[in-house]
A protein has these predicted regions:
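Conserved glycine-rich cofactor-binding loop
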Residues: 12-13
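Conserved glycine-rich Rossmann-like NAD(P)H-binding loop of the short-chain dehydrogenase/reductase
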Residues: 28-43
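Residue(s) in the substrate-gating loop at a strand-loop-helix junction
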Residues: 139
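Substrate-binding pocket helix/loop in short-chain dehydrogenase/reductase
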Residues: 95-96, 100-108
Length: 294
C-alpha cells in the first residue's frame, strides 16, 4: 500500500474518515473529498502526521465538474490514481410521497450519480494504465429494500447494478488489472442518522442489529489490497441476502416489520428535519455516530 494514491469521497465522517486514517497509517498518498472543508483540512493534517501524505479537495459529488476536478487534482498532485473509494452518501427518510421531491432527487444525485461520476473518472485513469481498484459503498438496502428509504434504496440498488455491469465489461474485454468492488453494509453506527433528512415524524433509529463501522473501514482497506466483487458487511445481512434468494416475500415482509417497529412504533415523536441533504451541517463529524452500546 505504501505510496499508493487513494481518493476517498465522503471523508469528513463515517467510513470515509475511518478509511482515510487507515490508509494514512499504511503510508499512502491521499486525496480527501467532502463538502465540509474545515473537517477535510483537519483530517489531512492528521493523516500527514501519521505516515501518509494527504491533500484536501472540497467536493460536492453531486456536481459532475467538481468530481472531474477532484480526479484531475489527484493526477496533478500525485501523477496517477491507484484506488478510488466512493463513500459520499445522504438519505431522506419518510413515506415516499411525503418526502419533498427535491430531497429524493438530491439522494439520487449524491448517492447514485455521484458514484457514477467518481467511477467514470476513476476508470478513465485506470484504463490509461490498465490498473486500479474502484470501491463503491452501497448498502444492504441495495439488495433488500426497507420502507421509508425509497430513494435511498433505489440509489443503492443502482450502485450495486453499476458495479456488476462494469465488471461484466472488464471481463468480456479481458481487462484483468482493474477491479470494481461493491460493499454492502448492514446498519452501522456512523453519523448517517445525524445527517439524513427525516420526514417520518419520529426520531431516527437504525434497523437492528447495529454494527461497529470499523468493520466496513477494515473491509475497504482489505479490498484495496485483495479486491473481491461484492461483500456484505454484517452477519445478519449475509443471512438475509441468502434467504432473500429463496423467499423474497417473507424476507421483505420481515424487513418491513422490523423497520416499522424500530423507526415508527418504538421511536419518540420528532419534528421534520432537513438534515445535510442540501447543505452540510456541523453535527456528525466522526467515524462513529454514538448510537451503539459497546
Amino acid at each position: 500500500m505504501k505510496q499508493k494514491v487513494v481518493v476517498v469521497t465522503g471523508a469528513s465522517s463515517g467510513f470515509g474518515k475511518g478509511a482515510a486514517r487507515r490508509f494514512a497509517k499504511a503510508g499512502t498518498r491521499l486525496v480527501l473529498a467532502a463538502r465540509r472543508e474545515n473537517l477535510l483540512h483537519e483530517l489531512a493534517d492528521e493523516c500527514n502526521a501519521t505516515g501518509g501524505r494527504a491533500i484536501a479537495v472540497p467536493t460536492d459529488v453531486s456536481k459532475i465538474r467538481e468530481v472531474q476536478a477532484l480526479a484531475q487534482k489527484a493526477v496533478n498532485e500525485f501523477g496517477r490514481i491507484d484506488i478510488w473509494v466512493n463513500d459520499a452518501g445522504v438519505g431522506a427518510l419518510g413515506m415516499f410521497d411525503q418526502v419533498p421531491l427535491a430531497d429524493h432527487i438530491q439522494v439520487i444525485e449524491t448517492n447514485l450519480l455521484g458514484t457514477i461520476y467518481g467511477s467514470y473518472f476513476a476508470l478513465t485513469e485506470f484504463r490509461a494504465r490498465e490498473s486500479g481498484v474502484l470501491i463503491n459503498i452501497a448498502s444492504a438496502l441495495g439488495k433488500i429494500p426497507a420502507p421509508y428509504y425509497a430513494s435511498y434504496a433505489a440509489s443503492k440498488y443502482g450502485v450495486v447494478g453499476l458495479g456488476a455491469a462494469i465488471r461484466q465489461e472488464l471481463r468480456e474485454n479481458k481487462i484483468t488489472g482493474i477491479h470494481v468492488c461493491t460493499v454492502m453494509p448492514m446498519a452501522m453506527d456512523t453519523p448517517f442518522f445525524d445527517h439524513a433528512a427525516n420526514y417520518t415524524g419520529h426520531e431516527t433509529a437504525p434497523i437492528p442489529p447495529l454494527y461497529d463501522p470499523q468493520r466496513v473501514v477494515n473491509m475497504i482497506v482489505e479490498l484495496a489490497i485483495d479486491p473481491i466483487d461484492e461483500v456484505i458487511v454484517g452477519a445478519a445481512g449475509k443471512v438475509a441476502s441468502v434467504a432473500h434468494q429463496f423467499a423474497p416475500g417473507a424476507i421483505e415482509s420481515f424487513m418491513a416489520r422490523q423497520t416499522q417497529k424500530s423507526q415508527i412504533e418504538r421511536a419518540p415523536v420528532a419534528p421534520f428535519f432537513a438534515g445535510a441533504l442540501h447543505e452540510p451541517i456541523a453535527a456528525g463529524a466522526e467515524v462513529r455516530g454514538g448510537r451503539r452500546s459497546e
